A protein has these predicted regions:
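Acidic, mature catalytic/reactive cores of soluble proteins
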Residues: 1-425
Length: 425
């Protein structure tokens, strides 16, 4: 009898959610509402972001990447400001905690969370231009603290080189978002200079340069250094093979990791891109051919040795696949930004991208965690959803992506949305 009651509750909830998904609500409105479930109150009354349901806690990197889409672009500016200021006050020696604990003993084990903080401040400024005074008072000191510690070699496992780029970690560490460990060793060793760390660091320095100009603090200007860094970046990371040109995934003294991964997108997509514009088309062409799927981007090209087509098996096997081909929807935000940057025919590019990702919105929202976006999908078709059934940065970056595409080509977007809701093309 108890089973029937539970079955009935389940059936009613499925109907309710399907009804919501079929309502007249816009996709942006729907994702904005879905995003609210990731904003949770901490015991001390502050707001935090849960990375995913049902088993993830609150992580610095995920919080910062998800924050704009969950708050600034979802009509929750106060909540977003609240979380961002809270994170800023948790900075210790230039580091944002990557794992938060209730007792205040946070773990500071990532090389990039602090650099994503700078990006989140940029997103706040873009969405809420009237917050410049708040940024000057509360965020600018944090950004300076981060740059001072990273650039001064005062962050564990992070060493600046003579050209101003950062080398992070050693063969036993995993300090980037591709942080899976199987049998005690990193599955995707990325020590050295991972391409997105170089892009994020350059973006942070360039943003600080523009704030220093705006706030009249010339000692924080870096214009000459930034020009030099762009040419060093190009020399280090640019790879040419028989299929065209793209960016290496990691540069280290003594060679580059030339496997095709999506991290190169951040050199094009961040507010201050480290790669020059005339190089965008070839990078995007390689990423589109090898990594783009209807549900997100593969973490590794299928032709690479070590590519895992399916996320399956025991914990070790799944960890082996986690960043070795598995598809992540959150990367669509960076991909969409890069596409818009490179586009000469904006409506055409928006139409093509929307057509590609239609299944994510037309089918997946009624699947897995109904109404939400999963953490990951298999690298090979049919790209079954896996991992958390509702992932903060998946929902957030999909919302930010739709916002950007709608802003760039409103007519194309409106037509696509109407069709996606009907289940057409």
């Amino acid at each position: 009898h108890g089973h029937n009651v539970i079955g009935e509750i389940w059936r009613r909830e499925v109907e309710r959610r399907m009804g919501l998904a079929a309502s007249s609500e816009s996709l942006e409105g729907h994702l904005a509402r879905e995003g609210e479930r990731f904003l949770v109150r901490r015991p001390d009354g502050g707001l935090a972001v849960t990375a995913g349901y049902h088993w993830f806690g609150s992580w610095g990197r995920d919080t910062l990447i998800a924050l704009p889409g969950l708050t600034f672009y979802a009509g929750r500016p106060e909540e977003g400001t609240d979380v961002l200021l809270g994170l800023g006050s948790a900075v210790r020696d230039g580091l944002i905690p990557n794992v938060f604990s209730a007792d205040g003993n946070h773990a500071y084990n990532s090389a990039d969370a602090s650099l994503w903080y700078v990006w989140a401040v940029q997103q706040m400024l873009k969405a809420l231009p009237d917050r410049k005074g708040l940024i000057r008072e509360r965020c600018w000191p944090v950004i300076k603290n981060i740059i001072e510690h990273y650039g001064g070699g005062k962050v564990p496992f992070v060493a600046p080189d003579a050209e101003g780029f950062l080398s992070v970690g050693n063969p036993g560490t995993q300090l980037t978002w591709m942080d899976a460990v199987a049998n005690g060793r990193p599955v995707t060793p990325r020590h050295g200079q991972p391409v997105e760390i170089s892009a994020l660091w350059y973006n942070a320095l360039a943003f600080a340069d523009s704030l220093a100009k705006a706030f009249g603090e010339p000692e924080w200007r870096r214009t000459k250094q930034l020009d030099a860094m762009r040419s060093v970046f190009f020399k280090r990371y640019w790879v040419t093979d028989e299929r065209g040109d793209y960016l290496a995934d990691v540069w280290r003294d003594g060679g580059v990791e030339t496997c095709v991964r999506p991290n190169q997108l951040f050199a094009l997509s961040l507010p201050y891109p480290v790669l020059d514009e005339e190089r965008y088309a070839s990078v995007l062409s390689r990423v589109r051919r090898c990594l783009l799927t209807p549900y997100g981007l593969r973490t590794l090209a299928p032709s690479a040795p070590g590519y895992r087509p399916l996320y399956e098996g025991g914990p070790a096997e799944r960890d082996e696949a986690y960043h070795q081909g598995t598809v992540w929807p959150w990367l669509l935000g960076a991909y969409g930004e890069a596409v818009l940057r490179a586009a000469w025919d904006v409506p055409g590019s928006v139409r093509e991208l929307l057509r590609t990702i239609r299944p994510l919105f037309a089918q997946h929202l009624g699947d897995a965690g109904i109404g939400s976006v999963s953490e990951i999908f298999d690298g090979d078709p049919p790209h079954l959803p896996n991992g958390c059934i509702a992932q903060a940065w998946s929902v957030a970056e999909c919302l930010r992506l739709l916002h950007l595409l709608k802003e760039a080509a409103p007519g194309v977007y409106a037509e696509w949305e109407a069709n996606a809701r009907k289940g057409g093309n």
